[in-house]
Amino acid sequence: ALYITEECTYCGACEPECPTNAISAGSEIYVIDAAGCTECVGFADAPACAAVCPAECIVQG
């Protein structure tokens, strides 16, 4: 699964991109539910959230 680092700017770009709704707003940064994250396998060639993240803070867990 992927996770979001502390460099997250809380912009919200990632949340609507997740096909499994595994991303939600945490208290200070967005968070990825590891149980729900498929890294977009079966949905896209690469993780959609990481592709749109302007801070490049969505990384491999």
UniProtKB/Swiss-Prot annotation:
The entry's [4Fe-4S] cluster 1-binding residues are: C8, C11, C14, C53
**Binding, [4Fe-4S] cluster 2:** C18, C37, C40, C49
Residue ranges annotated as coiled coil are none
Identify the SUPFAM superfamilies for this entry. Answer: 4Fe-4S ferredoxins
Function according to Swiss-Prot or TrEMBL: Ferredoxins are iron-sulfur proteins that transfer electrons in a wide variety of metabolic reactions.
Q: Where is the 4Fe-4S ferredoxin-type domain?
A: 2-28
The answer to whether keyword Lyase applies is no
Q: Which domain of life does this protein belong to? A: Bacteria
Q: How is the cofactor bound?
A: Binds 2 [4Fe-4S] clusters.
Keyword field: 4Fe-4S, Electron transport, Iron, Iron-sulfur, Metal-binding, Repeat, Transport
Q: What is this protein called?
A: Ferredoxin
**KW Metal-binding (keyword) present:** yes
Q: What's the short name of a Pfam family annotated to this entry?
A: Fer4
The protein's required cofactors: [4Fe-4S] cluster
Q: Which positions make up the signal peptide?
A: none
Q: Per UniProt, what is one GO molecular function of this protein?
A: metal ion binding
Gene source species = Chlorobaculum thiosulfatiphilum
Disulphide bridges? none
From the broadest rank down, the organism's phylogenetic lineage runs: Bacteria, Pseudomonadati, Chlorobiota, Chlorobiia, Chlorobiales
Q: Which InterPro entries match?
A: 4Fe4S_Fe-S-bd (IPR017896), 4Fe4S_Fe_S_CS (IPR017900)
